[in-house]
Amino acid sequence: MTTEDQTISSSGGYVQSSSTTDHVDHHHHDQHESLNPPLVKKKRNLPGNPDPEAEVIALSPKTLMATNRFLCEICGKGFQRDQNLQLHRRGHNLPWKLKQRTSKEVRKRVYVCPEKSCVHHHPTRALGDLTGIKKHFCRKHGEKKWKCEKCAKRYAVQSDWKAHSKTCGTREYRCDCGTIFSRRDSFITHRAFCDALAEETARLNAASHLKSFAATAGSNLNYHYLMGTLIPSPSLPQPPSFPFGPPQPQHHHHHQFPITTNNFDHQDVMKPASTLSLWSGGNINHHQQVTIEDRMAPQPHSPQEDYNWVFGNANNHGELITTSDSLITHDNNINIVQSKENANGATSLSVPSLFSSVDQITQDANAASVAVANMSATALLQKAAQMGATSSTSPTTTITTDQSAYLQSFASKSNQIVEDGGSDRFFASFGSNSVELMSNNNNGLHEIGNPRNGVTVVSGMGELQNYPWKRRRVDIGNAGGGGQTRDFLGVGVQTICHSSSINGWI
């Protein structure tokens, strides 16, 4: 055995060389742990975990709840404990005996709950003292006899009721809604309900706002008009360019009034035109788009263009009558431009949509074209007379705005043509026999325009709106009907553009 490996234990220490340093340190650490063992905490017995060596006692509910288990045979007074009864017997000069503690250790007792469904009914979960099992049975399974007068809370154990009465009303719990509670459990229950109600109310309010926004967005018009300018809505589909049928090849002239904007880019020019000609359907390109301001200036035109402006192409007068008839029939789909004076004295325009349902008008126009494709000029004039007679059936009945505008435009253009000396060409557009028909029925047409027959037409849209009772009849010429035609519609000679109108629109 070498000196490097030997150890000296006389003094309890170690003498070692450098080669045995690691081994000695490890041994010293183990010895230190053996001298100072770790502290072990003593675990408390949880409620319902009694000593397995304890005596288990099961009492009936009646015996357990009895307040006076020990009775005096002299006076009948009852006591909860036997020791109290023995002391009472001493007052009656009766033999009494108190229990003496012996040196022998007494076996511990535990009590089980008489309720079979209770968790403490099992012996392994029995409670350790008689008072504890009594209070447990009263609180969990007994009747709550004591009631607090302040908060109406009830208790089954009298001691609990007394402890609550001392602190009841001294502390309050206030909810955000303003309700005050003295009991914390009631406050917690109410607060949970109040928070859930607030969240539900916020959700319903958000849903109602979203629904109203959707309804408002859905009620917007397909087209918005601003100062006589047609602006298609970006969120809604645009109507087709031909609401009254396929386009017909014809000459575009100066009397068509497509509603266009003055400032437009190249993309707007390349798009299909969504404007609607006043009397005939057809496409117009960007070279033929004319602003409304340009219509104020006089421009040269031929009488044939005047006929086409009113009736379309003379070769297609059957289709023209169909279009005119559909315009008169569906008067609820055509709204004439109305002018309003604002506070500054300027004139602004409120132009509603020119048509409500394009598909419906197209179908109705096609159906009407089959029925009246061969309608003659006489039938057209009779239809105009019937329309005037219908509008004057009662003294308070007036012609609608759509019919008035249509008749005014019809009479103004026809009278202008007659004054220019083109009456033969005017009636020739209806057919070969239209001139003879007009000359033969001259007296009859004059009777239609007679005010005594009750057929009068308001001469201006402003008078129609502001003074519906004011009607007047304008005769052609200063001589009182001294021309080749008669004012059989009673609208008089009236131009389209007025000095009080804006952009040439009434």
Curated annotation (Swiss-Prot):
Q: Where is this region: Disordered?
A: 1-53
**GO MF annotations in UniProt:** DNA-binding transcription factor activity; sequence-specific DNA binding; transcription cis-regulatory region binding; zinc ion binding
List of residues binding Zn(2+) 1? 148, 151, 164, 168
Question: Zn fingers (C2H2-type): where?
Answer: 70-92, 111-141, 146-169
Q: What follows loss of this gene?
A: No visible phenotype. Roots of the triple mutant jkd mgp nuc contain patches of undivided ground tissue (GT), indicating that cortex and endodermis layers are not fully separated. The quadruple mutant line jkd mgp nuc scr has short root meristems, lacks endodermis and miss Casparian strip.
Per the record, where are the segments of Low complexity compositional bias? Answer: 9-21
**Matches recorded under Gene3D superfamilies:** Classic Zinc Finger
Which Gene Ontology cellular component terms are annotated?
nucleus
A single Pfam family, by name?
zf-C2H2
The protein's UniProt keywords, in alphabetical order, are: Activator, DNA-binding, Gibberellin signaling pathway, Metal-binding, Nucleus, Phosphoprotein, Repeat, Transcription, Transcription regulation, Zinc, Zinc-finger
Listed under GO biological process in this entry are: asymmetric cell division; gibberellic acid mediated signaling pathway; positive regulation of DNA-templated transcription; positive regulation of gibberellic acid mediated signaling pathway; protein localization to nucleus; regulation of DNA-templated transcription; regulation of meristem growth; root development
Basic and acidic residues bias (residue ranges): 22-33
- Annotated region (SHR-binding), positions in chain: 183-195
* Expression induction: Up-regulated by the transcription factor JKD, and down-regulated by SHR, SCR and itself.
Q: Which domain of life is it from?
A: Eukaryota
Locate the Phosphoserine modifications and list their residues: 60
Quaternary context: Interacts with SHR, SCR and JKD, but not with itself. Interacts with SIEL. Binds to RGA and SCL3 competitively in the nucleus.
Physiological role: Transcription factor that regulates tissue boundaries and asymmetric cell division. Contributes to the sequestration of 'SHORT-ROOT' to the nucleus. Interacts with the SCR and MGP promoters. Does not show transcription activity by itself, but regulates the transcription of downstream genes through interaction with other transcription factors. Binds DNA via its zinc fingers. Recognizes and binds to SCL3 promoter sequence 5'-AGACAA-3' to promote its expression when in complex with RGA. Positively involved in gibberellic acid (GA) signaling.
What protein name does the entry list? Zinc finger protein MAGPIE
Q: What is the organism field in this record?
A: Arabidopsis thaliana (Mouse-ear cress)
The taxonomy runs:
Eukaryota, Viridiplantae, Streptophyta, Embryophyta, Tracheophyta
Instruction: Supply the gene name.
Output: MGP
